[in-house]
Structures are given as structure tokens and as C-alpha cells.
Amino acid sequence: GLAAAMNVVDLPVHAKPRIAILSTGNELVAPGGTPGQSQIIGSNGPALAAFITDNGGEAIDLGIAPDDPKTLGSMAEKAKGCDFFVTTGGVSVGDHDIIQEVLKQAGLEVNFWGVAMRPGKPLLFGHIGPMPFLGFPGNPVSTMVCAVIFLKPAMAVLCGTDKVANPV
């Protein structure tokens, strides 16, 4: 009604970006589950899903994957067809930090790995074919700081804006 009252016939519209989320780590248990010894509830996936939805995207939560190359590779396949792929955990330099290695086998081209900030230093960015990829650290605070600083502006571009505000 408002557009018609202003005699505006054409309005730009953009589809919501579909963003796949994969949480990784043998230590993670899905919310509602019972953590065993040395396990924690995986909160990054639900937090990112809410963040993505609040910022105009459609969250595709792929759940939790263990630190297993075969499983991680098959989960990466499920992200294909999305507009963006985000993982949490597995991007630092520990023995179980295998995201970069596994996703390179799935076609990941790394644009950069590591940023000069804390929290969030081991952030990974690249592309799997035309799909952008962000690998966030597993720490929940690091994940959400990286989402605000890196994912939110990327989502704005995917939503068609030509003006991306500095998130900080």
C-alpha cells in the first residue's frame, strides 16, 4: 500500500541468503542431550541460527559433526546449494582441527586463515566453488564476535545492499 501511494511500481527484492551451519567437535552434544565426561552442549549452532535469522537470512543447521574426515566431508556436501557455509570449531592448530584439510579435499580455496584479533584469531575464509565459506573458532564468544564482524556484513551484501556498515 505505501509503495502504491507513493506511485512506486517496482521495488527491489532479494531472496533470503541460505546459510548452512555446521558445528564440529567430538566434545559436542546436541542441546537436550546429556553430556558425558569431557563433553559440552553445542550452543554455537543454535546461536548462529538465531543470529542469521535476525539478520535476514535463512539458517540451515546441519547439526554437529565429530572430528572425523569422512563425516565432515559428507556434511560439507550437504552445504552445497546454499549461499554461504559456516562452520564452528576445528580451524585452529590442534590435533583435532581438521576443517581446513578436509574442506580443501572438497574444493575449498582458502583466501585467508587467521586474523589479528582476539577473540577470533584462527578465523578461516575461502570459497567452495562459488559458495563463500567462513570457519569460526569453536569458543562461543569467538564464534559470535566473528559472526558480527565478518558474517553480518557478508549477509548484507548477499541481501543486495551496496552500503555495508562497520559492525564495530
Regions found by a protein language model. Name each.
Residues 40-45, 65-70, 113-122:
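A general structural motif
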Residues 102-168:
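Flexible glycine/proline-rich
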Residues 1-61, 66:
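Short, glycine/charged-enriched hinge/interface segments at domain edges or termini
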Residues 26-27, 90-93, 138:
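Short glycine-rich anion-binding loops that position phosphate/pyrophosphate groups of nucleotides
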Residues 10-15, 53-54, 77-79, 116-117, ...:
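Solvent-exposed alpha-helices and their adjacent loops that cap or buttress functional pockets
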Residues 49-105:
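N-terminal small/polar loop signature for handling phosphorylated ligands or for N-terminal nucleophile
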